[in-house]
Amino acid sequence: MSRQFTLGLVTLAGTAVFGLVGPAAADGIAMSHRYASLGDVSAVYHQPTRPLFGMETKATTGDVSSKWQAVEAEIEQEKIILTHCRIEQACPAAARELLDIVAEGADRVGRARVGWINRAVNLALIPTSDEAQWGVADRWSPPFETLQTHRGDCEDYAIVKYVALLEAGLSRDDLKIVILRDFVHNEDHAVLAARVDGEWLILNNNSLTLVRDSDMVGAKPMFVLDQDGAHRLRAIARV
């Protein structure tokens, strides 16, 4: 998943659609009260909604599942560090940077907060393939590692946003990393889906614009990764 491309907002016959529009471009730091918990920004809007992309899911195993399990384990360890950072006077630099991103969105709510964190993460990192950075075809990094190098590819962006939005108060039920198939470049791409006000929004690593899952064209959703593991997406069978 090395190619960097934008899933951007396009207008066709007056209708907004989601399309592929090309590439965009010190430990021991004292902490402050602004890192206090921001509360759940999505729970108040919890209501029955259509499934993500209007598709059903089926649990899956294999490479995607194994990589997600490994990253999830590291995320849980890093969340413990983030919890300590909120109450102690010192914190690793990468943890501080992640909490800075979260804190900068503290005066925003709902979609505005999600959009701010999407923007902040996109601007904090430099798109870099795993081959260029690590010398391997595909590597999924936990948030602190990505923020230490300030480089990563699509799934690294999505993972940082996933944890940042958890720290910002979104429920785990409202966050899913999505692996897509890009038909334009014939390769895979990862984004984050966040549910706000009962609506699924797509956060892309090269777009500052949030768009609805129902407006996406040019790519096929294949897998979702969340608190329940890895699942394959498939069309809902009609009866």
Model-derived features with residue positions:
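Hydrophobic helical h-region of N-terminal Sec-dependent signal peptides
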Residues: 11-14
